[in-house]
Amino acid sequence: MKIRHLLLLAGLVSAPAIVAAQQTALPSSSAAQASGDDDGGLTGSVSDESEWQDLGIAIPSFPTNASVPTAAEGGTTEALGRNVARVVFNDLKNNGLFKPVGPDALPAIAFPQVAAPAFDAWRGRSAEMLVQGFVKANEDGRLTVGCYLYDVALGSELARQGYVVKPEEWRRAAHKCADMVYSRLSGESPFFDSKIAYIAETGPKDRRRKQLAIMDSDGANHRFITNGQATALTPRYSPDYSQIVYLSYLNGAPRIYIYNIGTGQQKLVTSSTNPTFAPRWSPDGKWILYSMSVAGNTDIYRVSVNGGASTRLTDSPGIDVGGSYSPDGSRIVFESDRSGSQQLYVMNADGSNQKRISFFGGRAATPEWSPRGDQIAFTHLGGNFRIAVTDPSGGNMRFLTDSWQDEAPTWSPNGRIVQFFRTERGSGKTGIWQVDLTGRNERKLNTPVDGSDPAWGPVLP
């Protein structure tokens, strides 16, 4: 989308505000309608993945009722239909739960077949589930994208949704289609229609240029927010997606700023001249946790997003940083070296009842509480840097990655996937990676430059 203006003083560019994707009703298909509790013959769970990874899903190109020019990628509604199906295919392939087959390996279907599938033909291709849809140009210039999910074996319709979007927002319709399929088959909350903030890195490893950037969950629609004149670090989306809090060396010292996605404006979180860093949002979006160094001592503080006086939550002789709220806002996990090495601690939201939870050897840093509330992801330091998870009491710790230097985990909106950044040994090049909770499905996101400090935002409205 077109960048609207440049804020030279702050080194910022504005990001277009996200407009809610309008959902529209679709006509029912000729297939039998499955009941709401029909699981399509599946009995496994997302945690054990006993049969999910072998579930074959056919996703042919989305046809159009009439191929007409459109401002969307591809130039025509016919070409766009194939692109939409490709995005749906890639979303479902990359989450590690299913075995989809995309439009480039399947025959095209005619527009009338979208709501009247040829189930016998798809059974012959050993497809268990079928995703069909369409793209149609509206008189007002917008597009209607329809999405149907069918159980091939039962010959029934499991779900359907329609979306009305501007041509430049066509990828959102594709992600929402994939979300519908994923949620209906897995029982999990959606996460594809979301965005990621991260730090884009360029230059030699001893003089890295670090800019704030954002992109879709699959790496598309990339744009830089800051111009790189001042180093940016540790971004985090607000719970309503409207703002990003991050650390910037804009005036030479580490300070925390809140960037408004809709207006491109930013403001300081506190007026303190002391170094401030490691910002995190409260779940209700009313507070910012951050660390501040005063007279050589670093503690965790809380301040209203509207400014005002800060409240000190920790007061130890060590370095306390990296606070992350539990989903209900009642507790905070953070790292501290008060015991002599970096370890994980949990406290109540008011700073009371601080206790160490990491007793599994090595050091522990950069904790992030899962949106589900049942696990905490963190960086384990013990020879190398690995991403690990533990329950909030410090039990059931396990590693998700086994590389030289993986750090700074962030959760997908549904708590299903952990994203992090990996540094290559020797070159110092960094990249954004993600892994599911089994630790078996790992992949790298494509970014135009090196990337670090990822922050997965909420599902878009």
Curated annotation (Swiss-Prot):
Which GO biological process categories is it annotated with? cell division; protein import
| Keyword Chloroplast listed | no
SUPFAM superfamilies tied to this protein: TolB, N-terminal domain (SSF52964), Tricorn protease N-terminal domain (SSF69304)
Name the UniProt key words of this record, in alphabetical order: Cell cycle, Cell division, Periplasm, Signal
What Pfam family is a match, any one? PD40
Q: Where found, per UniProt?
A: Periplasm
Q: Where is the signal peptide?
A: 1-20
Q: Where is this region: Disordered?
A: 28-47
Reply yes or no: does the keyword Cell cycle apply.
yes
Q: Name one GO cellular component term.
A: periplasmic space
**Family, per entry:** Belongs to the TolB family.
State its role.
Answer: Part of the Tol-Pal system, which plays a role in outer membrane invagination during cell division and is important for maintaining outer membrane integrity.
The record's subunit annotation is: The Tol-Pal system is composed of five core proteins: the inner membrane proteins TolA, TolQ and TolR, the periplasmic protein TolB and the outer membrane protein Pal. They form a network linking the inner and outer membranes and the peptidoglycan layer.
HAMAP family, sorted? TolB (MF_00671)
This protein is called what? Tol-Pal system protein TolB 2
